[in-house]
């Protein structure tokens, strides 16, 4: 998960 933007994208 990403720490920014959309967490469900990464």
UniProtKB/Swiss-Prot annotation:
Record key words, sorted: Cell wall, Secreted
GO cellular component: extracellular region
Compartment(s) of residence: Secreted, Cell wall
Primary localization class, coarse: secreted
Protein name (Swiss-Prot/TrEMBL): 44 kDa cell wall protein
Source species taxonomy: Eukaryota, Viridiplantae, Streptophyta, Embryophyta, Tracheophyta
């Amino acid at each position: 998960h990403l720490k920014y933007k959309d967490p469900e994208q990464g």
